[in-house]
UniProtKB/Swiss-Prot annotation:
It is a multi-pass membrane protein. Part of the gene cluster that mediates the biosynthesis of the selective antifungal agent ascochitine, an o-quinone methide that plays a possible protective role against other microbial competitors in nature and is considered to be important for pathogenicity of legume-associated Didymella species. The pathway probably begins with the synthesis of a keto-aldehyde intermediate by the ascochitine non-reducing polyketide synthase pksAC from successive condensations of 4 malonyl-CoA units, presumably with a simple acetyl-CoA starter unit. GO terms for molecular function: transferase activity. This is Ascochitine biosynthesis cluster protein 8. It comes from Didymella fabae. Pathway: Mycotoxin biosynthesis.
Length: 379
C-alpha cells in the first residue's frame, strides 16, 4: 500500500539500515512472495546478476560468497551460518531486501502505475539508498529499473567503505557498540579522554556515529571496540550492547570515498526527484535539496559515510513536513527499530496512525543492558 490512495492519509515510507535484523527471514519472505509476483521475481533474479557482475571486478577475497551461490536466498542461507561478520554481504542483502520490498509493495496493486502523493521518505543509513529510488520513481517499472541501477551503486559504496575500514584495521570483527543511559555530551567527553589517554591516531579514534536521546552508537576499529566493551575501567561499566556494524560509517574524520567511482555513468542518475516526494537527511533533519537522483545519491553518500546519524532530529524533520490534522499511514520496508520512536512522536501530536509491514522478518533486536563487569572504576 505504499503509494495507494487511502483517502486523505499521508504516507511515510520507512527503510531501515543493514544492522537491524537477521537477513535470512526477510530474504526468505521475499523469495516466497516472488512466486506469485513476477516483477519481484524478476528483480531478485536481476539483483544476483548485478551483484555477481560487480563482485567479478573485485579482489578474490572480496564478496566471494556471491560468486558461489546461485541466488540471493542461497547467499542469505550460507551467510546465516557464518562465524564472522562480513559487512559487504550483510549490507548488500539488506539493500536487496529494501529494494525488493518496494517492488513488491507496488506490484500488489495495479493502480499504483501512476504517480500519487505526497509521500514522505524516512531512511536510516544505507536505507536512504532505497529511499532514493522511492523519491524518484513514479511507477512500478521505474522502481524496477532504478532499483537495479541503485543496487549497483550501493554495492560499490559498501565496497569503498569496507576498504576504507580495513585500511585502518584489517581484522574481522564488529566496529560498533551501543551505549545506553548516558547522554551524548557525557559520552563524548569520556571518548575524548579515552582517545587521548590511549594515544589513538585520528583514524583509529572512537567516535559517536549514531545518536538519539536514549542511546548512542560508538564506532572504532574492532580492537578498540573490544577494549572499550570489556577492559576500559570506565566505559566498560556503562550499559552497552554489541552493534552488528562491521565497518566505519558516519565518520567525518575519515577520508571521503570516491563518489565518481561509486556513481559510475548509469542513465537513471539524471531522473528527477518527484515534486511530491520528501526525503529527509539523517544528519540535518531537513529535506534533501537535490533535483536529480545523481544529486540525491551524492548527498546520501555523504550522510552514510561522513555525517553523524541523528535519530531524533531525523524523526522530528519528517514529522515537521506533515499535516498533523490528517491521518498517517506508515509503510515499513522491513523491520526497523526506529519505527516505535516515529509512532510515539506522531501519537503525541494526536495523529491517527496505521502501520503496515510490507514484508515480514525478524523483529528488530531490542537494546538490552549488559551486566557491567565486576572491575571497579579507575582513572
Amino acid at each position: 500500500m505504499v503509494l495507494q490512495k487511502l483517502g486523505d492519509a499521508q504516507r511515510i515510507l520507512v527503510f531501515g539500515d543493514s544492522t537491524i535484523e537477521n537477513k535470512l527471514p526477510v530474504i526468505r519472505a521475499l523469495w516466497e512472495a516472488s512466486e506469485s509476483h513476477p516483477l519481484l521475481k524478476a528483480f531478485l533474479q536481476q539483483a544476483v546478476e548485478i551483484i555477481q557482475e560487480e563482485t567479478q571486478k573485485l579482489a578474490s577475497h572480496e564478496g566471494s560468497l556471491f560468486l558461489h551461490c546461485i541466488d540471493v536466498l542461497e547467499v542469505a542461507e550460507v551467510y546465516a551460518e557464518a562465524d564472522e561478520p562480513d559487512e559487504l554481504i550483510a549490507s548488500v542483502l539488506a539493500l536487496v531486501a529494501r529494494f525488493g520490498a518496494l517492488v513488491l509493495d507496488l506490484e500488489r496493486d495495479d493502480s499504483n502505475k501512476r504517480s500519487v502523493g505526497p509521500v514522505s521518505i524516512l531512511g536510516f543509513c544505507t536505507g536512504l539508498l532505497a529511499g532514493a529510488v522511492a523519491a524518484c520513481a513514479e511507477d512500478m517499472i521505474k522502481v524496477f529499473d532504478l532499483a537495479c541501477e541503485v543496487l549497483a551503486i550501493s554495492f560499490r559504496l559498501v565496497v569503498a567503505l569496507v576498504r576504507r575500514s580495513k585500511a585502518i584495521e584489517p581484522n574481522a570483527g564488529l566496529w560498533a557498540t551501543t551505549f545506553i543511559r548516558i547522554s551524548k555530551e557525557e559520552l563524548e567527553m569520556q571518548l575524548d579522554d579515552y582517545n587521548l589517554h590511549h594515544g589513538l591516531s585520528q583514524d583509529k579514534k572512537a567516535y559517536i556515529g549514531v545518536s538519539s536521546q536514549s542511546w548512542n552508537s560508538v564506532f572504532a576499529p574492532p580492537s578498540v571496540i573490544l577494549h572499550i566493551a570489556r577492559q576500559c575501567p570506565i566505559l566498560s561499566q556503562i550499559s552497552q550492547v554489541p552493534t552488528t556494524a562491521a565497518m566505519a560509517v558516519h565518520a567525518s574524520h575519515l577520508s571521503r570515498p570516491d563518489v565518481n567511482w561509486i556513481l559510475g555513468s548509469l542513465p537513471g542518475l539524471e531522473t528527477p526527484v518527484l515534486p511530491d516526494r520528501l526525503i529527509v537527511s539523517t544528519s540535518t533533519g531537513k529535506p534533501f535539496l537535490a533535483k536529480t537522483l545523481r544529486e540525491l545519491i551524492q548527498s546520501i553518500i555523504a550522510d552514510i559515510s561522513m555525517n553523524i546519524l541523528d535519530i531524533d532530529g531525523t524523526i522530528h524533520g519528517i514529522c515537521s513536513g506533515l499535516d498533523m490534522t490528517k491521518p498517517v499511514v506508515i509503510s515499513a520496508m522491513g523491520p526497523s527499530p526506529n519505527i516505535p520512536a516515529l509512532t510515539r512522536r506522531l501519537a503525541s501530536g494526536g495523529v491517527q496512525l496505521k502501520t503496515f509491514a510490507v514484508i515480514a522478518g525478524d523483529r528488530p533486536r531490542r537494546v538490552v543492558p549488559r551486566r557491567p563487569s565486576s572491575s571497579g572504576y579507575s582513572s
